[in-house]
């Protein structure tokens, strides 16, 4: 399959974003998949147009977006995105939408159509912390996952799409002893394992849910 993997530019006064750092280190061929890479701005207003133009000019079987989730201690494939922008902080264009629908004609939520449990289990099988997430937040990460679901629903019925959040890397948590992080090479290994699992036509039926 031809897979587009995206990462984000740094945001919130940081000078590094582990999502893009990890994406740049992925191999160009993973299993039977050909990988293209794209850096997205952390911008509510810009990402949609960039994704739209990229999909209009290239054929991709899968789009897998990667984002930073500071404070998480695992690599977390996302199950679902919701139709809301509610930014705790402004984006890199100093734009801070609050309680705004992403697409007025979109569904309340879009579920990733990738085998997210198989991807999560593949990460865990590498001896890495992995967990299935049921919330992509309400910032630009959720926005991108929702927009991909919207595009699949309205324009690209055969497109497969998903999102994975990754933790901070160690240099981001210097002076923050209680904040979890993960070495970049382990994040790359986890993403590679997850991408390999995309080949699964059906997802695993295993218990990876939460009680709260």
Swiss-Prot record:
Keywords of this entry: Cytoplasm, Hydrolase, Protease, Thiol protease
UniProt xrefs under InterPro entries: Peptidase_C15, Peptidase_C15-like, Peptidase_C15-like_sf, PGP-I_bact-type, PGPEP1_Cys_AS, PGPEP1_Glu_AS
Keyword Transcription regulation: no
Reaction equations catalysed: Release of an N-terminal pyroglutamyl group from a polypeptide, the second amino acid generally not being Pro
Active-site positions on this chain: 78, 141, 165
A GO cellular-component term linked to this record: cytosol
Principal location class: cytoplasm
EC number, as in UniProt: 3.4.19.3
Database matches in CDD domains: Peptidase_C15 (cd00501)
Localization in the cell: Cytoplasm
Pfam families: Peptidase_C15
Transcription regulation listed as a keyword: no
GO biological process, any: proteolysis
Example GO molecular function: pyroglutamyl-peptidase activity
Taxonomic superkingdom: Bacteria
Subunit structure: Homotetramer.
Function description: Removes 5-oxoproline from various penultimate amino acid residues except L-proline.
Record-stated family: Belongs to the peptidase C15 family.
Name the UniProt record assigns to this protein: Pyrrolidone-carboxylate peptidase
Species for this entry: Staphylococcus aureus (strain JH9)
Taxonomic lineage from the root: Bacteria, Bacillati, Bacillota, Bacilli, Bacillales
Gene: pcp
